[in-house]
Amino acid sequence: DFGHIQYVAAYR
């Protein structure tokens, strides 16, 4: 699941 990817994208 790449659902957390959006979180990382916004985090960086």
Swiss-Prot record:
GO CC annotations on file: acrosomal membrane; extracellular region
Record localization: Membrane; Secreted; Cytoplasmic vesicle, Secretory vesicle, Acrosome membrane
GO biological process: angiogenesis; cell adhesion; single fertilization
UniProt key word Secreted: yes
Protein topology in the membrane: Peripheral membrane protein
Stated role: Specific ligand for the alpha-v/beta-3 and alpha-v/beta-5 receptors. Also binds to phosphatidylserine-enriched cell surfaces in a receptor-independent manner. Zona pellucida-binding protein which may play a role in gamete interaction. Contributes to phagocytic removal of apoptotic cells in many tissues. Plays an important role in the maintenance of intestinal epithelial homeostasis and the promotion of mucosal healing. Promotes VEGF-dependent neovascularization.
Name of the featured protein: Lactadherin
